[in-house]
Amino acid sequence: MDASQRLNAAASFILQSPPGEINDVISDLRTIVNDDDALQEGIQSSLEKYNQEQFVCVTVPGHEHQVIVSSAGLIPESGRFLDPRTKTSFVFDHLTLTASEPEPVEVDAESEPFRSALEESTLKYLADYFQEGVGSVFALNPNTFVIQIVANKYNPQNFWSGRWRSEYTIDLEKGEISGKAFVNVHYYEQGNVQLQTVYTPTFSLPTGLTPSSAPKILAIIGEKEGEHERALSDAYTDLGETTFKSLRRALPLTRQKLDWDKVLGYKLGAELAANRGAFGTA
């Protein structure tokens, strides 16, 4: 494999990095490529894509809260990112994950009241249902808004990490919300188990919406996310009772039968069950 092929492979590995493990991936890639300058240049575009798709968060310069770095907050003409809460733009370093050079931004006066109301309700929703979650609300135009939520849980001592991401596009003209929710979990104690799910709900909005309607919108979102969390829980239980059982030999290497009625008591099941709901869904 020549240098160009190694860099292409490295870029692909970046996009597949599990939650919270990208620094470990980059460290391993440095050993494989053995050329830091070439590696940094070769993976730059993949890092930018990964960070925006994974809703990487950064503390806003001069403030204590975090904002989501994503395509919804990208200012195309400058390449800077927007924190709509403080009306601040900043430069984001995709390698060091730091923000710098803050500047004030003039936002659209027509869309700001509704956006601000959605943000207030989103932050309350986070406080009620997520542990250390981050939310950002962007106005694409006076009739279209994007709510983004991300929550991470990293537990390297017990060999697992997880991330919840959700995005809801609110279209006032169409009277609908289209959503995407992603769950990524990586368990790697003496093995490599990954869970990846995608949920794409679409639902209608109440009529006659005003900024005061924001709590109703977040209540609908909370209901849908709660349904999704319960469906994941049911699917996980089914995996333990049926799918995993069919994959195992009748007698393992220990020559002892595995009690499948107690599968949730084994270590993998115990770890995942103990941390179900760690993202704080309803």
Where are these regions (language model features)?
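Alpha-helical protein-protein interaction scaffolds
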Residues: 1-77
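Charge-rich, solvent-exposed alpha-helical interaction surfaces
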Residues: 9-13, 25-28, 42, 46, ...
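Generic hydrophobic, helix-prone segments enriched in Leu/Val/Ile
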Residues: 14, 43-51, 57, 118, ...
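Ordered hydrophobic segments in well-structured contexts
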Residues: 24-28, 80, 146-148, 180
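Membrane-inserting hydrophobic helices used for pore formation or membrane fusion
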Residues: 48, 52, 58-124
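C-terminal/domain-edge helix-coil "capping" segments
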Residues: 49, 53-58, 194, 198-200, ...
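Surface-exposed short loop/turn segments
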Residues: 116, 120, 124, 128, ...
